[in-house]
Amino acid sequence: MKNSLLIYAPKISHFYKKNVWLKLEILNPTGSHKDRESVLLIKEAKKKNFKSIGCASTGNLAISLAFFSKIYQMKSNIWLREKDINIDNLKLIKSLGSKVFIKKISNLSKLYDLSSQLMKKRKIFNANPNSSNSKILANTEIIKEIYKANKKIDTFITCINNGSHILGLKKGLRKKHNLYGIFSKSKIATSINSFSRYEYENLIKHFNMKKDFIEAKEKEIFNGYKLLASEGLFCEPASAAVVGSLNKFKEKNICCIITGSVHKNLRSFQK
């Protein structure tokens, strides 16, 4: 996976009176940081002689895993929660060759548990959170790339759901630098409103859950959309929540990780 672009955001910087950079994971092949995870996970699966790989997902990992599995000639299995179904995403995942299982289940954590049990039984490589260190290491590469490109940044802000992404960033974080995670209860940002904490045991080891994880309100998500649009960027709600929440931080040299493209959320974006 090639380095994603790091850009300075002059209009967002002016609005917040801070220096703000954006790490554009949206430029990865399927438009999200999950591509980094998929490539490493598939390589690990092949090394261990698995013929098939699978995950439970709200969207981005499912699309990414389906895409790269076909390239690397592996079968892929995707578990989706019925309440999270995006028809466009579902069609895309199926068109990429994945076998899809849709479950009526109350939350994402339970879907992780169910799918993990089934994958173990069916000898499918498990790409769910807390199953392989490759998920963590893939995200560590993001912060390594930022440090290599920029010496001023000392604060990193990203979205959080199950924990793998932010744990990977934390692994590469330098001493005295700051890392914050944004979550939301808004129905607009479904990928970060379950806040499943599937990596909970690791999260409480490395973060102060009350200080380091910040809730974004719906108005902040909309503000994030507007600010990103002013820079010519259109991103998924989770990334808009990150940019729209910068007023909550005192730090002056900040990098926001723009984790996903709006292309998988175009219908909701129209609304």
Where are these regions (language model features)?
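PLP-dependent amino-acid enzyme catalytic core
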Residues: 1-271
